[in-house]
């Protein structure tokens, strides 16, 4: 289902949203006008969250063996990947026809660097299942020609027919992928300067030294994420409760990038009790 091109860098226009009502649900303006539904699956803890998210991804792979999975990195989806590997080892999943496209990659890190997202994905999923290496796609962090790399990656995503299911986490400031607050909603793949809060959050992966954290990254844009046929977000911990409430029960605004998911026709939020404690 195509994503209507009415998103600007600054505001969401309610009349324009209503013009696309068959595809997208309008933003929450007030209780009387509210007509969208964010599908929420509440889980008791991180393990339960990971299991239920893996259930959704497993169903996608089983029902469409040659599906395109949009994959995410960070701490939250690790448990989901562990469950997928378990199911592969039990003979329940076959990744041989699956194509993957990752959300993002640090700019300037060689893929063999232990903290590159290429390494993360191989360590947590790809090395443990039968996905064809030729079907694995990530932005090339070593390509310092940002314009060329962004065009290349957008072309890759188009060439595989777009994303069937996009897995996401959410940052404390509402970023998804490396789409930081105030980034335009209508961007495809682009190069971003990482926000200080993002650098702070990611320094734990670099021995706690923020000087080692790359300061730029390539990321799928909001436009590309919204074009996915299904979007699945995983969220856990009390530290995410405030942003979950703000993103999905507040206004749709580039100040909170994840808020745009309120308008996606097939968005599922899977969270533990702590993360969903304020909604």
Residue ranges and their predicted role:
Residues 70-74, 102, 139-140, 167-170, ...:
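Short beta-strand segments
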Residues 24-37:
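Short, Lys/Arg-enriched N-terminal segments with co-localized hydrophobic residues
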Residues 220-223, 227-279:
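ATP/nucleoside-binding phosphotransfer catalytic cores, i.e., glycine-rich phosphate-binding loops
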Residues 177-222:
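Class I SAM-dependent methyltransferase SAM-binding "motif I" and its flanking Rossmann-like core
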Residues 93-166:
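Ligand-binding beta-strand-loop-alpha-helix segment within the catalytic cores
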Residues 36-69:
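N-terminal glycine-/serine-/threonine-rich phosphate-binding loop
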Residues 63-89:
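Glycine-rich N-terminal segment of FAD-binding domains in flavoprotein oxidoreductases
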């Amino acid at each position: 289902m195509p994503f209507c091109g009415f998103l600007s860098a600054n505001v969401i226009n309610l009349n324009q949203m209503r013009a696309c009502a068959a595809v997208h649900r309008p933003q929450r303006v007030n209780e009387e006008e509210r007509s969208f539904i964010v599908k929420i699956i509440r889980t008791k803890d991180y393990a339960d969250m990971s299991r239920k998210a893996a259930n959704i991804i497993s169903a996608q792979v089983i029902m469409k063996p040659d599906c395109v999975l949009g994959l995410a990195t960070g701490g939250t989806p690790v448990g989901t990947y562990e469950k997928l590997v378990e199911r592969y080892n039990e003979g329940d999943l076959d990744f041989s026809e699956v194509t993957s496209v990752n959300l993002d990659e640090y700019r300037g890190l060689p893929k063999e660097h232990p903290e590159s997202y290429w390494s993360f994905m191989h360590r947590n999923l790809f090395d443990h299942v039968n996905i064809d290496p030729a079907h694995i796609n990530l932005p090339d962090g070593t390509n310092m020609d940002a314009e060329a790399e962004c065009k290349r990656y957008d072309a890759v995503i188009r060439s595989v027919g777009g994303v069937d299911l996009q897995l996401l986490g959410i940052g404390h400031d509402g970023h998804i992928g490396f789409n930081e607050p105030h980034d335009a909603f209508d961007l495809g793949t682009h190069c971003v300067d990482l926000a200080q809060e993002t650098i702070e959050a990611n320094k734990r992966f670099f021995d706690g030294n923020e000087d080692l954290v790359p300061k730029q990254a390539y990321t799928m844009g909001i436009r590309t994420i919204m074009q996915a046929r299904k979007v699945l977000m995983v969220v856990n911990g009390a530290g995410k409760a405030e942003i979950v409430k703000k993103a999905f029960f507040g206004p749709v605004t580039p100040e909170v990038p994840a808020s745009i998911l309120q308008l996606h026709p097939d968005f599922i939020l899977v969270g533990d009790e702590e993360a969903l404690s304020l909604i």
